Amino acid sequence: MFKPTLLLAGAFALVALPALSQKDIDLPALGSPADLSLSPAQEAKLGADVVSEMYQYDYIVDDLEITEYLSTIGWKLAAADAVNPNPPHFNFYLIADNRINAFALPGGYIGFNAGTIVAADNESELAGVLAHEESHVTQRHIARAQGDTQAADIATWIGVLAAIIAGSGNPNVILGALSLGQGINYQRQVSYTRGNEMEADRFGIRKMAAAGYDPMGMASFFGKLAAQTRLYGNRLPEILLTHPADTTRIAEATERAAQYGPR
């Protein structure tokens, strides 16, 4: 059964959280930062350090029922991934934010906004979001990227990220963090490439079907994002800046899902 009563009530309660979680802290989406070459050990450390920072800002909600629900879906997807039979140990976190978004940190740390749970119509749509983010991790989109920042100071990168998380409600703080000479060009680090997004879609749909979820769930959730694109016009919300949902992407996801048949 999708979204037990208590779980759904909890998600709506999180949506009603005060403005601190919605304005003062605005977690950047990190599904596929570019141009940073990392070893698996560095990936794990980076992800763990960022999660630690989020806990310090009370951005992660310790709701056992919802976290267990997301983890059950996520682990089911990971277990069905024949392409990556030895994935990292995924850790799933509920984020106190009413906006639709999810993000993947290196090392297998997946954040899921409360607003995404409320927006989803069924469990397959939630699975589509989780499968996409897991695929960013298993395909190692961070570590695969190459560039001049290969030898960059990871600790400094974490510091810049923490400053942006803490100061997202203050444009001056964000601009100050981005202007640091040691900031490793943060905007490029968190920018999604279309190639990575499409690859995460392809691998995500495959593991959805293998896990028994309706692979059309990913495309149907993209449709919700496309509707938001029309609603917001040029003032796109965070997830649409990082996860563009154009008609081509929706069509490709629909066509690929159809190859697996209904579930």
Question: What is the role of each PLM region?
Answer:
Residues P171-S179:
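Phosphoinositide system proteins, centered on phosphoinositide phosphatases
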Residues M1-L8:
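Bacterial N-terminal signal peptides that target proteins for export
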